[in-house]
């Protein structure tokens, strides 16, 4: 499916049909509809109106972008979009709609919105609208004349941004003030003609990124220092630096010219010497020496001018660094406004106290319930070592502990039958006096039986 982006990516030049939407050559019925004129009012058939406008409006703008132009005329568009000898009959309506939406603007209206008085200084590329255009507007006729120049607003903004970046990346950006002629040479590839170049400058001026001034009959342009900064008016310092830069260029050209003259005198002396014309050779050498002295004097002046410019550039850098330091100090003061050493120490103490409390809580939760008994791990380790040492010794020959025997015998045997249990119970009931037999429970063993009196 065709889109303005695809058409914009197509290379400029060549067969126009190859740069246009697919239906341009494939769908005769649709192209006949698109080449027909618009109805007098959109309300008559809004679907057909919107379909045509949706096709032609993006195509007009993308065609201009692909061609690298910001200025367009109805006549040029009709020639560009000819198809089999026919021209689109609705292009004037399309341009009127783009004007209404603000995507296009009359060149004269754009100039009136910006201070363009400097353009009249010997630059006769912009003229007032012809009288018939003015009368047609006064009478309410909104038709676009075939020769009237319109400006694509968005394309002009893109071109202005391109020129600004081109300047920023060039050696001319070493100082914000530059000669208009030098800037025009720099932008020769970006701006196809002089009128486009001046429109771009007007757009940059409208965005407050450049200002134009005439100095000694020559126009100079001052740029803003940063991409988001606003340009300041041209002051005496800017003019002085510009004059120094012009002097540097003039001296450099003069030195180059004198160097070529000195070399020419040297060649003349060599030829005269070969021809045996000694006096002529001496005169040529004297002229060479005089030229070299002039070159030395010009070099001294050039060094002085360059030294002054270097100091100015260094001072500008120092000013930028100073401003950065000043901004940094202000930011630090603002960020440290409520911070003091006492507050910092108090905050650290609170953090330490909270950390200690957290450690105590963690230890308490990790210890669990101990029934009030605290065990010393070191003492337990010592006792365990003693027990391990005792196991290596021979056991003592001691009598059996009756309590152990009684306790062992008192444990019921799960294998005893019911008859055995009854016999055991009978023994318990008949036993009187003395200690309970060894087969009785440990509790009864510890209770002596009293004899009757």
Curated annotation (Swiss-Prot):
Interacts with CHMP4B, but not with VPS25. Interacts with LEMD2 (via C-terminus). Residues 1-22, 392-453 are annotated as: Disordered. Residues 243-312 form a coiled coil. The lineage of its organism: Eukaryota, Metazoa, Chordata, Craniata, Vertebrata. Belongs to the SNF7 family. The gene is CHMP7. Pfam families: Snf7, WHD_CHMP7. The keyword Repeat does not apply. GO terms for biological process: autophagosome maturation; exit from mitosis; late endosome to lysosome transport; late endosome to vacuole transport; late endosome to vacuole transport via multivesicular body sorting pathway; midbody abscission; mitotic metaphase chromosome alignment; nuclear membrane reassembly. This is Charged multivesicular body protein 7. The modification Phosphoserine is found at residues 232, 410, 417, 431, 441. Keywords: Coiled coil, Cytoplasm, Nucleus, Phosphoprotein, Protein transport, Transport. Residues 392-407 have a biased composition (Basic and acidic residues). Residues 10-22 have a biased composition (Low complexity).
């Amino acid at each position: 499916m065709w889109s303005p982006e695809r058409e914009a990516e197509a290379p400029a030049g060549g067969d126009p049909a190859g740069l246009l939407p697919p239906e341009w050559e494939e769908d005769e019925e649709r192209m006949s509809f698109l080449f027909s004129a618009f109805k007098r009012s959109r309300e008559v058939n809004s679907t057909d109106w919107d379909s045509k406008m949706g096709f032609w409006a993006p195509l007009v703008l993308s065609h201009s972008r692909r061609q690298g132009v910001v200025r367009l005329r109805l006549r040029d568009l009709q020639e560009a979009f000819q198809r089999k000898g026919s021209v689109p009959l609705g292009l004037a309506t399309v341009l009127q709609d783009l004007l209404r939406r603000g995507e296009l603007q009359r060149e004269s209206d754009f100039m009136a919105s910006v201070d363009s008085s400097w353009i009249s200084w010997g630059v006769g590329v912009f003229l007032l609208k012809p009288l018939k255009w003015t009368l047609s507007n006064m009478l309410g006729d909104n038709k676009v004349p075939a020769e009237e120049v319109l400006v694509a607003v968005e394309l002009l903004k893109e071109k202005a941004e391109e020129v600004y970046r081109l300047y920023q990346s060039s050696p001319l950006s070493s100082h914000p003030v530059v000669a208009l002629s030098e800037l025009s040479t720099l932008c020769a590839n970006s701006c196809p003609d002089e009128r486009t170049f001046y429109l771009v400058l007007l757009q940059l001026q409208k965005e407050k990124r450049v200002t134009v001034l005439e100095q000694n009959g020559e126009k100079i342009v001052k740029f803003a220092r940063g991409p988001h900064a606003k340009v300041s008016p041209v002051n005496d310092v800017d003019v002085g630096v510009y004059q120094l830069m012009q002097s540097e260029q003039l001296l450099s050209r003069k030195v180059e010219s004198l160097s070529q003259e000195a070399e020419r005198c040297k060649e003349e002396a060599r030829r005269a010497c070969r021809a045996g014309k000694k006096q002529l050779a001496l005169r040529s050498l004297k002229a060479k020496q005089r030229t070299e002295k002039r070159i030395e004097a010009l070099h001294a002046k050039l060094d002085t001018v360059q030294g002054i410019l270097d100091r100015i550039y260094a001072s500008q850098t120092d000013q930028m660094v100073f401003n950065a330091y000043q901004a940094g100090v202000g930011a630090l003061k603002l960020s440290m406004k409520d911070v003091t050493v006492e507050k910092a120490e108090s905050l650290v103490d609170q953090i330490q106290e909270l950390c200690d409390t957290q450690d105590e809580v963690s230890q308490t939760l990790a210890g669990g319930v101990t029934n009030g008994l605290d065990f010393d791990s070191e003492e337990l380790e010592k006792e365990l070592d003693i027990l391990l040492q005792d196991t290596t010794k021979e056991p003592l020959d001691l009598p059996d502990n009756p309590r152990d025997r009684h306790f062992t015998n008192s444990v019921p045997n799960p294998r005893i039958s019911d008859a055995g249990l009854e016999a055991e119970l009978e023994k318990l009931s008949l036993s009187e006096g003395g200690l309970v037999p060894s087969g009785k429970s440990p509790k009864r063993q510890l209770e002596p039986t009293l004899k009757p009196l």
